[in-house]
């Protein structure tokens, strides 16, 4: 854990990585870790499919398939994380690739439950994965006693093997049932929600930070329902690691993306970055730093039926705190930005 005495307001951070780490074998290990994460869904699904070609595996595959159909652990918020996996070296390599660093502005009471709000979404929220779904950025050292579950779409849990991999990293469904279950288990159990969602990913551009937040009230209602505190988190640099094909609302690409989002619940950003073996073009993210500043919690009383006014007031306070993080640290972490923070509905 590194003390950030030179940055006002930050009391501790993920240790910075050595510059030499990008000039030796670790440079390639970092790239390999990011590549394997990028293709993890395809690899796990393919591995499962290939096994069906071998008759001796059929009894095991059939049993697994039945279990896959009936198991609802990802919806009910069951804790199936494997600490050894979250602490595995590849996730540290993953975080060092960019690098991804967490910055703490206050201590969090491990006797409380928290809803971490992650902004911006970026293309695929790689900072959220590295910083919160693994120990690659030392989350547990910075926030001892806080057990955070990163939340994602239900559709990710319908892929054989991949869904078990996600749950082993403490990644669960973003459904209401899952959220309430996790936040009601025991003190310290918390969730991370990428609040802008699919719509915000379509706005991701290097140098820009466009958030879809003004009409997102679900996470505030969840805070009231469970009595959880809200913690705004701003990931400076999340939008800079991929470029996106022009998709302004007048283009056919945007219209196609909107249709997919309405049908499937997620969208398909057409993005590009660098290659695994080249720095010019590919689907690998660029090596640009992602600095995640974790703000101060907003305590929310437990209420089954809060008034609209109470919801609006907490929502406004959350936005105020988030904008405060942006204004305080934008010149520290994004000195070369091309635009200021923009919030939309």
UniProtKB/Swiss-Prot annotation:
The species this protein was found in: Schizosaccharomyces pombe (strain 972 / ATCC 24843)
GO biological process, one term: lipid storage
UniProt keyword annotations, A-Z: Acyltransferase, Endoplasmic reticulum, Glycerol metabolism, Lipid biosynthesis, Lipid droplet, Lipid metabolism, Membrane, Transferase, Transmembrane, Transmembrane helix
Membrane topology: Multi-pass membrane protein
Taxonomic placement: Eukaryota, Fungi, Dikarya, Ascomycota, Taphrinomycotina
Compartments (UniProt record): Lipid droplet; Endoplasmic reticulum membrane
The keyword Metal-binding is annotated on this UniProt entry: no
Protein known as: Diacylglycerol O-acyltransferase 1
Pathway: Glycerolipid metabolism; triacylglycerol biosynthesis
């Amino acid at each position: 854990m590194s003390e950030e005495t030179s940055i006002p307001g930050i009391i501790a951070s993920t240790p910075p990585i050595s510059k030499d780490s990008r000039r030796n074998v670790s440079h390639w290990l970092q790239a390999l870790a990011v590549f394997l994460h990028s293709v993890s869904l395809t690899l796990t699904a393919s591995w499962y499919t290939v096994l069906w070609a071998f008759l001796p595996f059929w009894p095991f595959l059939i049993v697994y398939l039945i279990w896959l159909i009936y198991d609802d652990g990802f919806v009910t918020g069951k804790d199936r994380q494997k600490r050894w996996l979250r602490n595995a070296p590849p996730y540290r390599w993953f975080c060092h690739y960019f690098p991804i660093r967490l910055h703490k502005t206050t201590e969090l009471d491990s006797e409380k439950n928290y809803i971490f709000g992650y902004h911006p979404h970026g293309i695929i929220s790689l900072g959220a994965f590295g910083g919160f779904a693994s120990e690659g950025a030392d989350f547990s050292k910075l926030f001892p006693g806080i057990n955070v579950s990163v939340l994602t779409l239900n559709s990710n849990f319908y892929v054989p093997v991949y869904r078990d991999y996600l749950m082993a990293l403490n990644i669960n469904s973003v459904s209401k049932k899952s959220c309430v279950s996790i936040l009601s288990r025991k003190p310290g159990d918390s969730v991370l929600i990428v609040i802008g969602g699919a719509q915000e990913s379509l706005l991701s551009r290097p140098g820009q930070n466009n958030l879809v937040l003004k009409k997102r009230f679900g996470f505030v209602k969840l805070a009231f329902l469970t009595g959880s505190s809200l913690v705004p988190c701003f990931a400076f640099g999340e939008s800079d690691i991929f470029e996106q094909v022009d998709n302004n609302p007048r283009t056919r690409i945007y219209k196609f993306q909107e249709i997919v989002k309405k049908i499937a619940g997620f969208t398909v950003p057409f993005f590009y970055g660098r290659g695994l073996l080249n720095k010019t073009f590919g689907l690998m993210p660029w090596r640009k730093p992602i600095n995640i500043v974790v703000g101060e919690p907003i305590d929310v009383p437990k209420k089954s039926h809060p008034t609209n006014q109470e919801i609006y007031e907490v929502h406004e306070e959350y936005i105020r705190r988030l904008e405060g993080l942006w204004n305080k640290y934008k010149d520290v972490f994004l000195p070369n930005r091309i635009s200021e923070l923009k919030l939309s509905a």
